[in-house]
């Protein structure tokens, strides 16, 4: 997928996460921890892309460089999928990479699971992410607060992308 921001074209693609990507993902999670609570799929044992078990997990590649991760997962028995995405450092923000990655991951997921809504939670203070999700078609459907292990309480929005 090609996109442009500020006149600079960026080629964005996805590749399935493999077990040997975990060290990079852990390092990237350190950057993302300041603006999101969850940097991995819900299945704590997951370490790779596994569509047969409902996990579509990808490394985001921009201009040939690994720059983040995106996942769509369908927990067993769930009536909606869950989306997560993050980029590895601030230099990649605001370039359209997140929106492109979400669209690519959703296309793969929906080829196997048409007609399911996709949900996420995003910190209310994360305006850049909220704008990204809105560009991808998500709408705010509710709000709440989450208590972090540190004791901090973080307000969030629930967002949903309706089925196609």
Where are these regions (language model features)?
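Short acidic N-proximal helix/loop "leader" segments that mark the beginning
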Residues: 1-8
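A short beta-loop-alpha structural element at the N-terminal edge
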Residues: 11-25
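Conserved beta-strand core positions
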Residues: 12, 81-83, 118
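Acetyl-CoA-dependent GNAT
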Residues: 16-20, 30-93, 99-108, 112, ...
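Residues within well-ordered alpha-helical secondary structure of globular protein domains
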Residues: 27-31, 135
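Conserved N-terminal glycine/acidic-rich loop preference
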Residues: 71, 77, 83, 101-102, ...
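A generic structural micro-feature
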Residues: 77, 96, 151-155
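C-terminal "cap" of GNAT-fold acetyltransferases
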Residues: 115-119, 123-130, 135, 143-164
């Amino acid at each position: 997928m090609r996109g442009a921001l500020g006149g600079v074209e960026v080629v964005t693609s996805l590749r399935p996460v493999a077990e040997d990507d975990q060290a990079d993902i852990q390092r990237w999670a350190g950057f993302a921890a300041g603006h999101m609570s969850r940097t991995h799929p819900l299945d704590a044992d997951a370490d790779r892309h596994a569509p047969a078990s409902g996990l579509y997990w990808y490394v985001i590649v921009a201009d040939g460089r690994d720059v983040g991760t995106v996942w769509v997962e369908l927990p067993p028995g769930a009536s909606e999928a869950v989306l997560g995405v993050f980029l590895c450092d601030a230099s990649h923000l605001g370039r359209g990479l997140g929106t492109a990655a979400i669209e690519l991951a959703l296309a793969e997921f929906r080829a196997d699971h048409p007609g399911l809504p996709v949900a996420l939670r995003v910190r209310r203070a994360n305006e850049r992410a909220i704008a990204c999700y809105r560009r991808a078609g998500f709408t705010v459907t509710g709000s709440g607060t989450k208590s972090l292990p540190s004791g901090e309480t973080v307000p969030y929005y629930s967002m949903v992308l309706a089925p196609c």
